[in-house]
Design a protein with these regions (language model features):
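Membrane-anchoring alpha-helices and their flanking helix-loop junctions
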Residues: 1-106, 113, 131-188
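Solvent-exposed interhelical
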Residues: 109-120, 124-125, 167
Length: 188
């Protein structure tokens, strides 16, 4: 029978393969963030992801468990991870050709407000954060839980860069959207 950690690994591998294939459908960017901006959020997200996903020996005491191992706890994390990845995929499908792995605007870029974008302005980040919380619960290590705020910081840096760019491009329309829809967590 498959164990929770194996299920988590499968979820992330399937998501990554699909995400890479979907990237081939993105339109060409006409405005793109600076290399420095990409570097800052990229390093934070990568460092946090290594802590959440990794089991490297150099992490030493950070690999200690946080709570007693129970199968139901691991499977709860798997469910959260699957839900988060599904939400991120739904958002990626909804944004379609306007998606970019970097902070960018596409030719004829439209402000997407439907589907998951009616729930949160950055549903891909929301979904990925939920998936990482689920992964940390399943991994059950201090390193995994310490990695979560590091990933959040990286995504927050990118979110702020995107917000500035979208505000410049869409002006009052984006201001209205910002007033109506939360950035990451619904109802907050």
């Amino acid at each position: 029978m498959i164990r929770p950690l194996e299920a988590i690994g499968c979820l992330w591998l399937v998501w990554l393969a699909g995400w890479m294939l979907a990237a081939l459908t993105a339109a060409k960017s006409v405005v793109r963030q600076s290399g420095t901006g990409r570097l800052v959020h990229g390093l934070l997200v990568a460092a946090g992801a290594i802590l959440v996903l990794g089991r490297h020996s150099w992490l030493g005491p950070l690999l200690r468990q946080v709570y007693p191992a129970k199968a139901w706890i691991g499977w709860t994390g798997v469910v959260l991870c699957a839900a988060g990845l599904a939400f991120a995929v739904w958002a990626r499908v909804q944004i379609g050709r306007f998606w970019s792995g970097t902070v960018a605007l596409k030719a004829e870029h439209a402000l997407i407000r439907g589907g998951p974008y009616a729930i949160t302005r950055h549903p891909i980040y929301s979904g990925l954060l939920l998936a990482l919380v689920g992964t940390a619960i399943t991994r059950d290590s201090r390193a995994a839980f310490l990695g979560l705020p590091v990933v959040f910081a990286g995504l927050y840096v990118k979110l702020k860069q995107e917000e500035r760019l979208l505000l410049e491009r869409f002006g009052p329309e984006y201001e209205k959207y910002r007033a109506e829809v939360p950035a990451l967590i619904p109802r907050l």
